[in-house]
Amino acid sequence: MGWLVADIGGTNTRCAIAKPGGAVENIEAFRNREFPGLDRLLAAYLGALPPRERPEEAVIAIAAPIRGDEIRMVNINWTFSVSALARTLSLKRVIPLNDFAAQAYALPVLGSHDLCQVGGGQAVDRAPRVVVGPGTGLGTAGLVRVAGRWHAITGEGGHVTMAPSDEREARIVALGRERFGHCSAERLISGAGLAFLYGALNAGIVLTPAEVGTRIEAGETAALEALDVFFQLLGTVASNLALTFAAFGGVYIGGGITPRYVEQFQASGFRTRFEDKGRYRPFLADIPTWVITADQPALRGLAAYAEANA
């Protein structure tokens, strides 16, 4: 019968049915703002399925810390109980995972056609891996192999304090502290962060993330500069994670922004910044970095998790 799998972001939710063997079917996307809560959104998806295809269990990925039965999402005003959600949807079990745990569990099932390597390095089989991805927020996770199985290590790495690497970034971070109090990595490396960077580099011009995206697509010099700074900052965070995990299995860049701009990412200062760690430059030069170009990697990761924990 399969599992309900759902990737619940701050803006959109994608639902599907995971079949035995890891196949993902019946993928549907929803705008979160069109529903008062997650229960109504998932009920809409399940209600459209033929009764014989309705699953009895679910694995859901959530863009929020998971510290118990009650979950409070960060980038949308949704709070819910996992046990109550299962009862409301008539499911025997609902397993919540951090959204980037789902991304991490996808890494072992991605093929070369799902990835675009940027820079050098060769992955070491079964070594730790890292995934980081800017979108509505900035997600991070590690993946380590213990006793023959992969285990995701999640946290809130997007909220670490952003450290500047040059005078221009120092000015940007100072503006971030003025605006937000604490200038975390997510304040600069996310959709809203890209818009903030554009304003910081252009006399405070206020644009939405979508408007900055339009200017990037049009080839505007100022927008492309903001994107390059964005990718360099991402390089700083990615290399910090690579050092923390000794991620010789590779660093994978996901999220909704980078895969949209692969050409600009390849030409950016990301990899130079990634390796720019002084005495540890040779260490990082050996670690490969990839952009995840696969469709729905989180759903594939949830399917892999469901298969392993059926």
Where are these regions (language model features)?
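Short glycine-aspartate micro-motif
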Residues: W3-D7, E57-V59, I95, R129-G133, ...
